[in-house]
């Protein structure tokens, strides 16, 4: 028996199963979003649908991260960088997330956008930022601000909320392992975000994730 071949087959099966579940979850999410927009939905059901929408987005982000990590481990090229207009990406993030956050009385707004263009994988970066914004559904009090600026040769995307901030363990600069739970994360999302950042490299510069409290949670994605 070829243990290496068996492991490869098992990995392929798991990746395929995760992909199928992700597709099914996407259908559930689309249906929930469609029903939520219907005027005839009772208030009590509307609240449940919004929670379902939030949790489905969170699970979908985790599955996308898991698939991405599978591809990285298999040596697949995950990052396909291109020139991206930063303001367009911010507008896209606002459009996708504003309605859900507004249902909780949270205003999602654009802050200062100093970077006109960046060179990165738009899909991966949008996925990371959407997951971070969706997470503020539980932790922001009333406001979340998206901004983008240039610093030391990096394009920096920032998600700032007015909640209680990140816990000490998440601020310790020690990368969380997948499955390790903390105040605001299961670990997988942050682990994948760090890997996406690190896969963006230019000359001597390597992308990174920076977490701070200002005093609410401040997530920064630094892309060279």
Indicate residue ranges for each PLM-predicted region.
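Short alpha-helical segment of the dimerization/phosphotransfer core of two-component systems
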Residues: 54-62
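Conserved glycine-/histidine-rich ATP-lid loop and adjacent helix of the Bergerat-fold HATPase_c
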Residues: 192-206
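Residue-level recognition of the "H+4" position in the DHp/HisKA helix
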Residues: 16, 23-27
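Conserved C-terminal segment of the DHp
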Residues: 27-42
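Conserved micro-motifs of the catalytic ATP-binding
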Residues: 74-79, 117-120
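Conserved catalytic submotifs in the C-terminal HATPase_c
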Residues: 82, 107-116
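Glycine-rich/acidic phosphate-handling loop/turn and adjacent ATP-lid/helix
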Residues: 160-187
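Short beta-strand/loop element within the Bergerat-fold HATPase_c
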Residues: 143-153
């Amino acid at each position: 028996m070829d243990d290496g071949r068996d492991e490869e087959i098992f990995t392929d099966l798991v990746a395929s199963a995760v992909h199928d579940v992700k597709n099914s979850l996407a259908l559930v999410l689309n249906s929930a979003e469609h029903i939520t927009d219907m005027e005839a939905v009772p208030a009590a059901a509307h609240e449940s649908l919004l929670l379902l929408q939030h949790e489905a987005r969170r699970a979908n982000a985790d599955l996308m991260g898991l698939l991405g990590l599978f591809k990285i481990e298999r040596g697949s090229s995950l990052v396909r960088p291109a020139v991206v207009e930063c303001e367009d990406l911010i507008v896209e993030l606002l459009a996708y997330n504003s309605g859900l956050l507004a249902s909780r009385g949270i205003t999602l707004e654009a802050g200062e956008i100093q970077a006109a263009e960046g060179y990165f994988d738009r899909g991966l970066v949008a996925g990371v930022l959407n997951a971070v914004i969706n997470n503020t559904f539980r932790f922001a009090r009333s406001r979340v601000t998206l901004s983008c600026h240039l610093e030391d040769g990096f394009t920096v995307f920032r998600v700032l909320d007015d909640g209680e901030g990140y816990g000490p363990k998440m601020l310790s600069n020690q990368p969380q392992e997948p499955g390790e739970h903390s105040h605001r994360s299961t670990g997988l999302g942050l682990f994948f975000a760090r890997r996406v950042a690190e896969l963006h490299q230019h000359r001597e510069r390597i992308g990174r994730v920076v977490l701070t409290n200002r005093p609410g949670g401040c997530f920064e994605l630094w892309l060279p």
